[in-house]
């Protein structure tokens, strides 16, 4: 089995090393990640600059691009034979609810699925992020299960693991995405030259963290698995929009 591993925290991040070590037990892995932290990169591609590669001492390959660039480049150019699966992570922090729209971790998995391969994204949720070994354990279990029973062709699995010792995790829940309140405002400050600058503020608190959501599962000590689709069409709105279309006049 061949597995392509990527992330958005950068090729030197602790999470991608833990994930690679775990998956090396069952697969031939190729680890290709951005040369810097690309958190929040979503599905962005590098279109105006060339991509430069560097092979590190541990065999990982760094790319001067986004997580999506990494997966696209690896599959198109670095593999003689295609991988069997794409695994993205282990992200340093949650990718739940609205986070998935901005996440480079989820985007790397999404690019794998766009290109026709089973794909999962895995994140470690907590404040101190001590237990990458727990997330790696569940990544290994889930990859083994996918090897035996693949999921639908147009889906990826978004996995969030509570930052707990393995023995304290209560199990796995299949969940839907929750939702956050609107993000807090920008942080206004000055650079050393006295010029005004802005930082993005923290994300909003949970708005929908009810039973059945990813937020609820992780908060209660469970691993959350949420199936995501790459087709963003709101199918339930199609017929309503057909009726609405009659209101548009020349």
Curated annotation (Swiss-Prot):
SUPFAM superfamilies, A to Z: SurE-like
Necessary cofactors: a divalent metal cation
Binding site for a divalent metal cation: 8-9, 39, 91
EC class (word): hydrolase
Main location: cytoplasm
Listed Pfam families: SurE
Catalytic activity: a ribonucleoside 5'-phosphate + H2O = a ribonucleoside + phosphate
GO molecular function: 3'-nucleotidase activity; 5'-nucleotidase activity; exopolyphosphatase activity; metal ion binding; nucleotide binding
Catalytic activity, EC: 3.1.3.5
Compartment(s): Cytoplasm
Note describing how the cofactor binds: Binds 1 divalent metal cation per subunit.
One CC-aspect GO term: cytoplasm
InterPro entries, alphabetized: SurE (IPR030048), SurE-like_Pase/nucleotidase (IPR002828), SurE-like_sf (IPR036523)
Keywords: Cytoplasm, Hydrolase, Metal-binding, Nucleotide-binding
PANTHER family assigned: 5'-NUCLEOTIDASE SURE, 5'_3'-NUCLEOTIDASE SURE
HAMAP family: SurE
Family named by the database record: Belongs to the SurE nucleotidase family.
Function: Nucleotidase that shows phosphatase activity on nucleoside 5'-monophosphates.
Protein name per Swiss-Prot or TrEMBL: 5'-nucleotidase SurE
